[in-house]
Amino acid sequence: MSRIGNIPVLIPNNVFVKKQDNIIYINGPLGKLNQKIIGDINIIINNNNIIVKRKHNDKKNRALHGLYRMLIYNMIKGVYNGFKKKLELIGVGFRAKNNSNILDLNIGYSHNIIIKLPKSITLEVKMEKNKNTQIILKSYDKQLLGIVAAKIRSLRKPEPYKGKGIRYINEYVIKKTGKSAK
């Protein structure tokens, strides 16, 4: 029995939910999202909550039960409040620039890396004196936001000796000791 899957999802006032065939559509103040439902999973939409039920108790449906409940919850939370990911550039000379949703990174390579972000993601770059540069990504789509943030981080992962690179805010990097002198 899925404990997460049994919890009903509350629908806020400004969010509209519609189910058509095997697709659930969620529309809110920040945007529109949809999710295709596969397997024997039933979505029941009441007045202001959504209940996810499974028809059969086989292994696949038990796995999908909690998954779809959390996907729907994240979609509703995203179109109502939105999500935010913060990245930090750590290293001498590491810079980031925002040119109308195009991220221009100077992270120690011989050339700048230019990333064009999807329209649903907004970008903000904070550069303060004596602090590391921060990249703040905001979106209503949690899946897309996570993919884009992971792609940016993968361009220069934090290295284990000095910790230089791109990392999430509050990410802890285990540092190795260097060579020991004789």
Curated annotation (Swiss-Prot):
A single Gene Ontology CC term: cytosolic large ribosomal subunit
Tagged with keyword NADP: no
UniProt superkingdom: Bacteria
GO MF annotations, alphabetized: rRNA binding; structural constituent of ribosome
GO biological process per UniProt: cytoplasmic translation
UniProtKB keywords: Ribonucleoprotein, Ribosomal protein, RNA-binding, rRNA-binding
One Pfam family cited in the UniProt record for this chain: Ribosomal_L6
Family of this protein: Belongs to the universal ribosomal protein uL6 family.
Record's function text: This protein binds to the 23S rRNA, and is important in its secondary structure. It is located near the subunit interface in the base of the L7/L12 stalk, and near the tRNA binding site of the peptidyltransferase center.
Subunit structure: Part of the 50S ribosomal subunit.
Protein name according to UniProt: Large ribosomal subunit protein uL6
Organism the protein comes from: Karelsulcia muelleri (strain GWSS)
